[in-house]
Every structure is written in structure tokens, then in C-alpha cells.
Amino acid sequence: MAGLWRSNSTLDVERGRNRTQTETVQTVPRQAQGILELLSSPAAREALQGSDFARWRGVPVSPAGGYFELAPLRSVNTFARGLRSVFGGSTSRREAYIPQHGFYRLNYVLVAVVPHVEHSDPGEVTVQLVENTNPTRAVDGQELTARLADGSFVFAAAPTYDIVLEQAPILVEGESAGVVQRMFGIRTSVSGSLTTGSVVSVYPIWSAEFPIQGATFNHVAPSIVHIDRFNRSVAFEIDVLRRRFSLMRPLHLARSRESFQVGRMSLDVARPSVVRPPPVDPQAEGGIHVNSPTSEQSQGEDRVPRAGLASGTSVGEGANHEFLSGAVKSTAPVRQT
């Protein structure tokens, strides 16, 4: 969890690193450069301010791989005192953003992966949804591998269970190696690449909450949407992917007035408790489509995250996907490990 709380000296180091990254971007292929600028643009950050997503920040990944926990970073500070009053705990910084009782629910995670390699690079990148107590094992088979030469893509995954907020031992090669707070995370590894240094950057966004009642969920296979050039079609496809995970997973869900949703509080009684997106017409856009749930599948759904990929409404509508303007998806093969 290092880096969640940063001192002034740490910020100075990050500013220097950001300048180095800016210089490095100039050497990457034009496609990756454009995508990086798009994902890091002020418009993207501003559009996500009101959403349920906890993070929209590039994380460089070296050939040795990388791991980060899907813990709330930004907006949870707004209601940290509310979390403590509901769930108890001290006023330490750790307990200010993770309650000590109840459950951690990861609704879904989307990870934009941007390679920084030549078009002929033979390497592959594997993205896994893992639990930090066993960071080398994918949760529920939520793992996919793609060729670096195929370009940028978005990886979507979701677990089938809630995590109990408790301390648990870390397993490294089957042996205990300390104790941590249980959390979900994303592990990225690179193999076979001829590039040294940072091979890819990952941009994780996710929706999570801390309910006081646990639930189990339908299994939804992990998915990848390849991106060649940004246009409205791919923005539409990514949002369909998000809807698929948010609508098809729940088996049983007990909505609680004491449930806090990352990005905003879920106690707004002025809004309806059920917000379903309009049905998706698979023929409306070109490219590869992700099946949306039927009305029978979505019946009984108590909670749907209110935010779209860009802001409070779908990125497939109106001006909310301006920062995702562009894309023709490729039909590059994806190998599931």
C-alpha cells in the first residue's frame, strides 16, 4: 500500500519522475503516445471526478511485472469519518479509508493497457485479478494474455465473492510470509519482450464498496477490448463491457443504508435505488460486441453503479466520451491462460 499517503518529499520525487515519463513518451509509437495523452488529459480527469472509479493514473510496468491493490484512494477521504462512525476503528490513516468490519466488494475493474514496444516485439502481457494474500494466483480464472505487438487494449474482470475485512497471511510459494489486510489487486507480468525498462503502462479504474452484508455473484469470464484508434465505437464497446459486469454478476444483494460506495455515498434517498442503462443494440455499432444481459437476467438487481466510464452517464451517449473519442477495434487473437 506504499504510496497511498505521500509526503511533500515524495511528491517532489514524483514530479521529477513525471518529467522523465513525459520525455519518454516522445519515443514511443505515435499510437501509444496519443492514447497516453488522452488517458492523462485534464478532460479525462475532470470527467471522472464525479464517478465511482477510485483511480485513473498510469502505472509503469517493468519486465519483472507489477502489482497494485484496488483500494480506494481519492474520494473515500471525503467520508472517512462516516466510515469510522459506522464500522468503528481508530483515526489512523490506514483505518481512515478501509473499515475494520464488514466486507470489501469489488463490483468490477477495467484496466487500460498501453504497450511501449515496437510493432514487431514478440512479447506478451498477462493481466490477472488476484487477492493480495496469494498474489500469483488469478481469482476465479480472471486472467488473460495478449501480444504486446497487437497494441492497446482494455481488460475487464470481476470476482465472484466479497472479501471479509480481516487480517490474513500472505502465501508465497505456499509458505506464509507475513500478515496483510485482505484486498483484491491487479497483477501484470510481461514475458518474451525485447524491450527493457517500462514495457507497458496500465490505467486501472474500478467500482468498489464496503457493505455490512456479504454476497456471492455469478461468474463472468474476463474480457478484452482491443483498441487500434480511438473513436466513439470503442468508447461504446467499453461501456457495454462495463454494463455487462455490473448487471450480470449479482446473485443476491442486500442493499444497506450503511453501505458506502467508492466515489460517492450510497445514502442519497432522493435518487432511485435502481438505475438500469437502456438496452444495447448489437447492430448499432461495428466491431466485436459484448452481449448485454436480458431483462430476465437483470431482474432482481438492487444496485447498479451510477457512473459510466467517463462520468455520471454512459460514455456512449452525448459529449461524455469526448476524451474517449475514436477507435476501431482490432480482431487480434487473445489467448486465455
UniProtKB/Swiss-Prot annotation:
Composition-biased stretches, type Polar residues, lie in 1-11
Gene Ontology CC entries for this record: host cell plasmodesma
Instruction: Indicate whether Ion transport appears among the record's keywords.
Output: no
Region (Disordered), start-end ranges: 1-24, 273-337
What are its GO biological-process terms? transport of virus in host, cell to cell
Q: Which Pfam families match?
A: 3A
| Keyword annotations of the record | Host cell junction, Transport, Viral movement protein
Location(s) in or outside the cell? Host cell junction, Host plasmodesma
What is the documented function of this protein? Transports viral genome to neighboring plant cells directly through plasmosdesmata, without any budding. The movement protein allows efficient cell to cell propagation, by bypassing the host cell wall barrier. Acts by forming a tubular structure at the host plasmodesmata, enlarging it enough to allow free passage of virion capsids.
UniProt name for this protein: Movement protein
Q: Which organism is it from?
A: Olive latent virus 2 (isolate Italy) (OLV-2)
